[in-house]
Amino acid sequence: MDEQELDTRELDEAQRQEKLQALDAKLAQIQELLQRMENLAQLASRPECTPPRRARLQGEFHRLKGEIDQVADSLWML
């Protein structure tokens, strides 16, 4: 294997590592959003949660779902 092939392999490995780090960051972002969604669902399920508050929580839940969709769509661009 010559020096140019070694340089190319090292570059390829560095690019793979960068991509894995970017994917890891995106997955961590999705995990945070899912945790918030779980918290919203728990709040909405409480008996003392009023219908207007439940509607606000549901609105935030759907907004977070949209954010997850955006993050998931961005994974294809990596």
Locations of the language-model features?
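Amphipathic alpha-helical polymerization modules
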Residues: 1-78
